[in-house]
Amino acid sequence: MFSPPLFIIIILAQRPPPLTGYRIAKLFHTTVHYGSISGTDVDKLNGAALWTVNYDDGDLEDFEMDEILAAIKLFAELS
């Protein structure tokens, strides 16, 4: 599993960078699905940074920090 340096985790947790337009990839079972980051938000219950991903097939999903970093990394590896 991808582990970003601690200083990156602290910065992202305090103020999520928009990352709008970044491409991501996520593995669902045995199929890779691609999408783009379309926005950011903060979880009102726990204050966690969230990034909204709009998949190429039209689905939407919110990612937490560790998930979005892994998805960006996977896209880079597959490109």
Over which residues does each language-model region extend?
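Eukaryotic chromatin- and chromosome-associated nuclear factors
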Residues: M1-S79
